[in-house]
Each structure stands twice: as C-alpha cells, then as structure tokens.
Amino acid sequence: MLLVLTALAALLLATLLVFNWWHRRRDERLARLSLDDLTHAESRLELVACLEALPGLHATEAARVRDMLCLSPAARRELAGLRHGSASRRAEACRFVGRLGDTAVVPRLVELLCDQDPAVRREAIRALGELRAVEAVPDIADAIEGLKEWSNLVLLMALIRMGPACAPAIGALLAEHGARSPAMLKGLLQVTSRIGVATDPAMIRALASHEDMEIRVEAVRVLGAIEPDPRSGDVCLAAMDDAEWPVRAIAASSLGRLRDERALARLRGAMGDPAYWVRHHVAEAMASMGEAGSESLRDALHAANPFVRDMAAQALFMRALAEGEAA
C-alpha cells in the first residue's frame, strides 16, 4: 500500500512539474512575441488576442498592427469565411473583419447586405460601420429598410459610428423624404441628431412640420443638436404649440440647447403644460438660459399652479446641485 501511495504521489508531482514547465514556456514565448512576429501568427487564439488589444494602443501603433495582421495566414483564413457556404461562418467572418479594419473587404460586405440570412446582413451592417465605410451608407440604409429594423439601435450605431463624415450621405437620403418610409426618416433623423451635423438644416426645419408625429419629434430634436440658428429657434417655438406633447417636450429641450432667450416668455407660459415631461423639459431649458432663466424660475415658485411651483423648485435645486459639484 505504501508503495502505491508513493507511486501516486510521484505521478502527481510529475504532472505538476510538466504543467508548470508548459505554462512557463508559454509565458516566455508570449514575452518574446514582438510586432514582427505578428505577420506569422498561425493561431486563431493569438489573432483574437491581438484584436482585443488594439483599442488600448495608440492610433499609429494600432494601424501598424492591423496592417501586419491582415497579412497573417490566420487572418486570411478568417477573411475567406466571407464566402463560406455556412451562414453562421459568414456572419462570424463579418464580425472579424469589422474588428480587423481591412477596408479591402468593403465591396464583399456590401454584397453581403443582400445575403439571404438576416443575421449575416446585420453583421455586415455592423462591420461596415466599424470600417467607417461612408460610401456604403445608401446600401446600409436600404439593408436596414429591408430588415424593417430602424428601431434596432445596434444597426443605427453602425451609421452613428461613422460620425460627421456620413452627414452628406444621410442628407442625400433625407432629401428624398417623399420616397422614404416614415421609419427610415425617423432613423436617419436620429442618426443626424447623434452626429450633430446636418448638411441641409432647411430640410430638417421642413420635416419639423411632417404629418407623422414621431418624425416631427426627431426633426425638432435635430434642430437642438446641430449648429444653432435663429431660424431653428423659430421652428422650435412654433413646435411648442404642437397638439402632441412629445413634440412640445422635445421642442422645449431643443430651445434650451439653442440658448435662445427669445423663447423665455413662451417657456414661462408652458410651465403649466398638462404633460409632465413638457413641464420637465421646459424647466430644464429655462435653467440653462443663465440668470434670466433662473429669475423666471424663481418667479414661478410663487405661481398659483402647484405643478408649476414644484417643477420650478426641482429645476432650481438641480442647477444649484450642478453648480456646487462644478465648484
């Protein structure tokens, strides 16, 4: 029995020594890994690890690593997956190329926007967004329309990620608003609001009177997000009289962003709006307009309407809190 226990102990010790040696060799190999070695990366695991490290690198270093990774056999195998017969492999390849940053695959990704499998189309949209493929914006918009997923924020983020560079393409699509679905117009306006640039503000102002309430909401939101313009303030002031409370609420918010003090009188009148969110955004807008807005809120503390008093007190408290934190 003692002999058996001794043998088991020896076997366990040998196993531990082997594992220790293997881990030590692996760590030494990783420590020796340099940028030049990346061009010979055969292991998919190493490739994925390199991709995950890219966000932490300086832009110049990240670009150099990407260029070398594109030449590796492992990357070429992944890129070949864009033409694989399996939809899951094509979708996985789309995810990979978006992270790799190889713009040479943009034409193939555009083709995949028409793939029979919806999952492949979604991943192709996301990959094109990561590659900042501005030239593919019309194709991306058509693909989202085909999927009927303008409410899918993940897909909209593909356009938003491109930043102001995609504004001309978005503007061209909005210019054809008569031929676009309400869902597409709403989605494109949301993108415009997030990137903060509109190539044709006059068209946005026109859409603020669209028959579809949600389009009016998004158009008015855009007017508060782009370069301030007195004409935008006029449109937002008019929107304060909209029959639908969401439009009035966003109009008040945009007036606050525009810092248009001409709106103070109209905002004071809207402090008693029957809709809570209108009152909330009105008070926030007034608080953003400096001392004149704060004075109007202090006056509202003595209003006969308890809802007006409550919202004024809330806005003044939040402003004092923000100023205290800033100090």
Where are these regions (language model features)?
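Solenoidal tandem-repeat scaffolds enriched in leucines and small polar residues
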Residues: 148-217, 222
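Amphipathic alpha-helical scaffolding segments comprising HEAT/armadillo-like alpha-solenoid repeats
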Residues: 69-82, 102-114, 133-145, 164-177, ...
